[in-house]
Amino acid sequence: MPQVDPELFDRGQFQAELALKASPIAAFKKAIRLAGEVLDKRFRAGSDIRPLIEARAWLVDNILQQAWNQFDWGDQSGIALVAVGGYGRGELHPHSDIDLLILLGAAEHEQYRDAIERFLTLLWDIGLEVGQSVRTVDECAEQARADLTVITNLMESRTIAGPEALRQRMLEVTSTAHMWPSKEFFLAKRAELKARHHKYNDTEYNLEPNVKGSPGGLRDIQTVLWVARRQYGTLNLHALAGEGFLLESENELLASSQDFLWKVRYALHMLAGRAEDRLLFDHQRSIATLLGYSDENPKRAIEQFMQQYYRVVMSISQLCDLIIQHFEEVILADEESGSTQPLNARFRLHDGYIEATHPNVFKRTPFAMLEIFVLMAQHPEIKGVRADTVRLLREHRHLIDDTFRTDIRNTSLFIELFKCEIGIHRNLRRMNRYGILGRYLPEFGLIVGQMQHDLFHIYTVDAHTLNLIKHLRKLQYTPVSEKFPLASKLMGRLPKPELIYLAGLYHDIGKGRQGDHSEIGAVDAQKFCERHQLPAWDSRLIVWLVQNHLVMSTTAQRKDLSDPQVINDFALHVGDETRLDYLYVLTVADINATNPSLWNSWRASLLRQLYTETKRALRRGLENPLDREEQIRQTQSSALDILVREGTDPDDVEQLWAQLGDDYFLKHTAADVAWHTDAILQQPADGGPLVLIKETTQREFEGGTQIFIYAPDQHDFFAVTVAAMSQLNLNIHDARIITSSSQFTLDTYIVLDNDGGSIGDNPQRVKQIRDGLTEALRNPEDYPTIIQRRVPRQLKHFDFPPQVTILNDAQRPVTILEITAPDRPGLLARLGRIFLEFDLSLQNAKIATLGERVEDVFFITDADNQPLSDPQLCSRLQEAIVQQLQAGQGSDTSQTRVTF
């Protein structure tokens, strides 16, 4: 801490101002405000962070001493003002709590009551954010014995005013001789750390991390120092190095990492104007700029800053894990030496942990840096790596160079890991944590800590990749096989499961580089296969999977799967059933590893449908595609059989069907056609809109809720329908619009509730939906089609130009309208209003919400059911859509394309 800093606080000048004022409050406030401005100015100018937070603590020391001296304490031998917690360490950020202990020597302290109350009132009046307690020495001992937080705070203390002897008495009665011996304290702090990490999903890679509490945050460093203080009486990183728990290089890395997080936290407090430790989207751009990250693309600057953040917290996690494991080995060690068991000449087990047999193992036999992970996969009883061996790995990873990467012993060991029955994910994660994976695969090193500034990808690229491999492993286990039955079954019969793990490892490895990441990744995967001398068939499959890992999800979500041509084109692209099996499993794992909320029952159904129909096409032979007319005949024949069995007159059926057109029978199954037909024929002529609701499938974890509407066609039908569904809190995922020759509309919507599930067996909810839609369609003129809702906080920070593409389908008489835009409440209803204004008919729609953006595809025609052919009409349509999508946003540009 500075001994004196007149620019920050001049004692003489301050006391002179106090003497001139009737009330001290204004002088204190002015001093605090001016000092804060000085510190913020120094921060913006790039001053070192440590002197800044120490200077703020020094400032508060002076303010508190001056405030303390405003009151008559009489005999001061029995009272002291003590700083505890972070302030006790001499560290204060702009809005950190100032934790104070008013320490009393005896239980009888009535003489101080009035002065204490007036002192605390003054602190609040002058704007200090104070957390205070008033305790005697004995009360400190009593509460510290019962509360881990109290003993932790008291360990970090400084006397601000009053006799130091009181604090020394307090430290004596709360020492390890009286309570919380180091072993008990360590176990409690370790449990506290694990619980805190679990609160933040046990990952350093949250989209909006907490710089203090998240794994790898400042609290992890403090936990290590608290344990060290309890065990050794030391409370700084340099002293830890002196005790042998840290190398000097590790001490420097941990200190620089702490400084980086201090800068981020200081900036957060300064920008938020309050104690804010969450690195929210609201602040990420401003902090990136403040800390000097720049790019022509502001989004890229944020990603650069966050990648640095994630790499820093990963380093902190690694080093804190190492120190805590050292503590375990020292503090929890039994009296007698632990048992050892040899594994081979290079490694042995020590109390269940693997360790090197001598310090030069990795220097003499570098291949052991990969062998250790294979051994742990082959021996799942191994609990982990001994701390000294982790340090040896870190010290020798520089030996992993191009020669190492092409050594057949090393390439063979790496492939061997992927053939192990268990432990693949666990040991790849260890390799990444210890910095081995990124050294062995430099292309993987590029994606470590790399984030994408959106709500779709909730993990960094490396974390997502390892999550994907973890999900592939889970597909073999019963709990998830119930949720993913087809993927689990296929995973169990893949001829070479190691190939899907390798494809998963490389599927996103091209991200962050200029160009298509699938193509870049395929090139890297090809080089990997050649370096590891994989057979030609294996190499071709891995490269193909990397290159095409997005094709299946894109087809399922954006194409009309009822169109035989779509299925045939996809089957031609895939080529054979083996590739189809691998691609389906990889796609399921990829979606779930990207963001668990993306996986819903309807997406599961779409992928199953695409898989099943493609498999049929492949077995039928690609030279024998299913004919549209043949599919229509099959659907009608099967539906008629169902209806006749139920007693329906075939003539009535044929009369109705003659009005519906071919597309209706292509877009619906025979069971649905029979269900619709029976209900329509029983509907009274003046019965109003017919609204039917049922589940699309009885399979658990699949399907959605199908809403079928039959009513006289009207101009604003779609706009009113989607607005009503929005008000009913339904998310539309698919829409099929048919208009009969008798001018009735037959619309089918696939919807999910806000939680991503179908409506299910809920009669009250079904009635609410049916009544709400019926009322809206009976009185469309009274129904608002523009829904006003509050935009969620996170969505506000992802404002990008909408992309609108209009093109005519070469195979069908429709125009395809593709829209990518920020997700906003009521978006579909707004588009429905535009379709109404332009006299357009919607034939089909595929709706996908991916994090903060929507990717919607609409199949539209003009009023005569023809594709749009007027370029000026298309331009006006595009302009209207962009204006509507940009309403209330900051975007002023868009990307558009019109093709005929």
Curated annotation (Swiss-Prot):
Residues 461-583 form the HD domain. Coiled coil: none annotated. Residues 706-784, 816-900 form the ACT domain. CDD domains: ACT_ACR-UUR-like_2, ACT_UUR-like_1, HDc, NT_GlnE_GlnD_like. It comes from the Bacteria. InterPro entries: ACT-like_dom_sf (IPR045865), ACT_dom (IPR002912), HD/PDEase_dom (IPR003607), HD_domain (IPR006674), NT_sf (IPR043519), PII_UdlTrfase/GS_AdlTrfase (IPR013546), Polymerase_NTP_transf_dom (IPR002934), UTase/UR (IPR010043). HAMAP family: PII_uridylyl_transf. This is Bifunctional uridylyltransferase/uridylyl-removing enzyme. It comes from Pseudomonas putida (strain ATCC 47054 / DSM 6125 / CFBP 8728 / NCIMB 11950 / KT2440).
